């Protein structure tokens, strides 16, 4: 499979899985009325409407802020997509695809709902992680992949990480 097709397929799969889980939890499972749903002693499903970015930073409560975040996500996805089109490494295109799919998934939420629907809450004892969704997990996994690719690229001395690579 050509690298670009692999990256685009990864982005599409991430987007579809993200939106399917959100629609399923909102419409079919009626999570807003049933929350919290305990999955395990350390995991539950809840409803959080995130008007900010990662970890709730930069909360935007105005329409201007909402649309600025949508615009930033679209521009970032386009830039990463352009990088993906020129990338040769499988890990690089997979990582970029995860990030693009996650960014677009969260942008769809902002357009449809005015905020991002987060629902997975992990916790143990007094420790609690931020509530997140499939798109967020894709973005984090993609960034981790970029870090691994950077280390491998440096070790190989190649140009796989450069956008013109």
Swiss-Prot record:
EC nos: 3.4.23.36
Keyword Transcription regulation: no
Principal cellular location given in the protein's record: membrane
Pathway annotation from the record: Protein modification; lipoprotein biosynthesis (signal peptide cleavage)
Biological processes per GO annotation: proteolysis
GO molecular function ontology, one term from the record: aspartic-type endopeptidase activity
Subcellular location(s) of the protein: Cell inner membrane
Membrane topology designation: Multi-pass membrane protein
UniProt keyword list: Aspartyl protease, Cell inner membrane, Cell membrane, Hydrolase, Membrane, Protease, Transmembrane, Transmembrane helix
Active site: 118, 136
InterPro entries to which the protein is assigned, alphabetical: Peptidase_A8
The reaction(s) this protein catalyses: Release of signal peptides from bacterial membrane prolipoproteins. Hydrolyzes -Xaa-Yaa-Zaa-|-(S,diacylglyceryl)Cys-, in which Xaa is hydrophobic (preferably Leu), and Yaa (Ala or Ser) and Zaa (Gly or Ala) have small, neutral side chains
Top-level taxon of origin: Bacteria
Cellular component GO terms, alphabetical: plasma membrane
Transmembrane segment boundaries: 64-84, 88-108, 128-148
Functional description taken from the UniProt entry: This protein specifically catalyzes the removal of signal peptides from prolipoproteins.
Family membership: Belongs to the peptidase A8 family.
Protein's name in the database: Lipoprotein signal peptidase
Organism: Methylobacterium sp. (strain 4-46)
Gene: lspA
